[in-house]
């Protein structure tokens, strides 16, 4: 519910051309509907909300938006609802000036498959920004319908900043996903920092190479915010204590197994479970240290 409320509020705040849907009660009703269904329903309702605001600008804008949204839906509906969260969060991250947090978070939580939904989210945000910036021309009667469509088409296809951002998002998602799934210690933290640095470097040098106007301070602050948010996600989602890592091995009739066990940070050492694997009987015996301690105290008493 909260995510849907934020999404619909941000869309109304960014566009807000149709007064009938630019209303807190409409946002609340749509948010309640989304609370009962999957994230895909929220995505479809958000697209319909965008389409309604575009219709208030002009029929040409609404038609162009409908074609663009259908193409995006064909892409992102092929993925799971968890991956499609990236499509919803990307426009929000731009309005909050922390776009780097989306590819970093998607890379550690969902993997490389979320690169496509996040890229679609980038295109969706820049299209809404285009409609907002060119609303005066698009609403004017002196501009021909074909000129309006050409304006929208050029604003999407020739937007170098948008395509640079799409490439950066895809690169960061893939890099973070690969590093975070490695077996070495602190893989998530290294992936988060690496992803933020890659975002900053590609955005800065890409902007210089493509002559795109960007704010250096905003890019750096977005990268720093991505690191902070990534560490928070790592603490709640992974939360392991690498200082207590244990390496062990066991074998059966066919294989020798080398196991690296990293305990959760919130699990105290006295409550951990020790599993002993027997190769002959292939029986797993679980011995809990706290129960052994209690048995010893009972016998002593």
Tell me the role of every PLM-derived stretch.
Residues 239-291:
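Short, highly charged, low-complexity non-transmembrane loops/tails of multi-pass membrane proteins
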Residues 290-301:
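Short, charged juxtamembrane terminal tails flanking transmembrane helices
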Residues 135, 181-185, 212-216, 232-251:
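Juxtamembrane/interface segments at transmembrane-helix termini
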Residues 16-25, 39-43, 59-65, 82-86, ...:
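Short, aromatic-rich membrane-interface segments at the entry and exit
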Residues 32, 45-118:
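Membrane-interface helix-loop-helix junctions at boundaries between adjacent transmembrane segments
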């Amino acid at each position: 519910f909260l995510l849907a409320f934020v999404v619909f509020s941000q869309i109304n705040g960014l566009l807000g051309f149709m007064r009938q849907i630019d209303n807190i009660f409409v946002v609340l009703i749509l948010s309640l509907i989304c609370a009962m269904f999957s994230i895909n329903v929220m995505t479809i309702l958000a697209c319909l909300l965008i389409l309604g605001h575009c219709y208030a600008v002009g029929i040409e804008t609404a038609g162009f938006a409908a074609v663009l949204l259908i193409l995006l839906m064909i892409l992102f509906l092929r993925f799971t609802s968890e991956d499609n969260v990236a499509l919803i969060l990307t426009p929000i991250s731009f309005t909050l000036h922390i776009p780097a947090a989306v590819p970093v978070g998607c890379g550690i939580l969902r993997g490389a498959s979320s690169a496509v939904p996040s890229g679609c989210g980038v295109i969706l945000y820049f299209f809404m920004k285009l409609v907002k910036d060119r609303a005066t021309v698009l609403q004017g009667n002196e501009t021909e319908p074909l000129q309006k469509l050409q304006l929208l088409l050029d604003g999407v296809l020739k937007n170098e900043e948008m395509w640079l951002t799409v490439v950066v998002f895809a690169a960061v998602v893939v890099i973070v996903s690969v590093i975070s799934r490695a077996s070495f210690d602190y893989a998530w933290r290294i992936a988060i920092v690496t992803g933020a640095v890659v975002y900053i470097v590609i955005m800065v040098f890409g902007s210089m190479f493509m002559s795109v106007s960007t704010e250096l301070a905003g890019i750096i602050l977005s990268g720093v915010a991505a690191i902070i948010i990534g560490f928070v996600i790592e603490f709640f989602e992974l939360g392991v204590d690498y200082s207590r890592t244990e390496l062990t091995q066991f074998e059966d009739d066919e294989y020798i197994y080398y196991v690296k066990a990293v305990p959760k940070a919130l699990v105290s050492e006295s409550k951990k479970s020790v599993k002993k694997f027997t190769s002959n009987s292939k029986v797993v015996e679980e011995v809990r240290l706290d129960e052994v301690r209690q048995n010893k105290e009972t016998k002593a008493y």
